[in-house]
């Protein structure tokens, strides 16, 4: 009887230690993801998409913003050039990969290894993926929506 009682106590202690350890790991992962969402890279992406969506003249914004790479700027304007050459119109926004985007967003996730930032509009279900890249010590948006996301 003593052996069974001792075994039950040892088992209970072992289960509690494992549960405590798993909880600690889970909490540290939450802290890491929260710090990644608030990282400079993710905040640059958030600032870009918020500014872009609130502008009435997006082409002027894309021409002048310092938050994007030249590659993204070039791809953005290439879409309009191609449409003009083909006597076509651009009816969807390639930066948000759709139409009618909100003007306020929040960062959902950021992967520091891939540079992928996912944002979502406040009271909006659709998510937008952006790619950030550090160039000359400065974080810039290098891809968004359907542009340069390969």
Describe each PLM feature range.
Residues 19-22:
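Boundary at the C-terminal end of the N-terminal hydrophobic targeting segment
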Residues 73-124:
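Surface-exposed, charged secondary-structure patches
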Residues 30-38, 58-62, 118-119:
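Second-shell loop/turn segments in exported
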Residues 127-150:
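Short beta-strand edge/turn micro-motifs at domain boundaries
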Residues 36-57:
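Short, aromatic-enriched amphipathic alpha-helices that serve as compact interaction elements
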Residues 4-13:
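Sec-dependent N-terminal signal peptides
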Residues 53-85:
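Short, solvent-exposed secondary-structure junction/capping segments
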């Amino acid at each position: 009887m003593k052996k069974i009682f001792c075994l039950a106590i040892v088992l209970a202690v072992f289960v509690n230690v494992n549960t405590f350890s798993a909880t600690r790991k889970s909490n540290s992962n939450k802290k890491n993801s929260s710090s990644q969402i608030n990282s400079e890279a993710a905040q640059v992406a958030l600032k870009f998409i918020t500014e872009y969506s609130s502008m009435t003249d997006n082409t002027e914004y894309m021409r002048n913003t310092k938050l994007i790479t030249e590659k993204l700027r070039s791809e953005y304007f290439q879409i309009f050039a191609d449409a003009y050459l083909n006597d076509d119109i651009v009816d969807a926004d390639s930066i948000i990969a759709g139409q009618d985007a909100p003007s306020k967003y929040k960062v959902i996730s950021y992967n520091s290894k891939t540079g992928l930032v996912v944002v979502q509009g406040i009271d909006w279900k659709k998510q937008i993926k952006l790619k950030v890249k550090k160039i000359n010590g400065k974080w810039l948006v290098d891809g968004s929506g359907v542009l340069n996301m390969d």
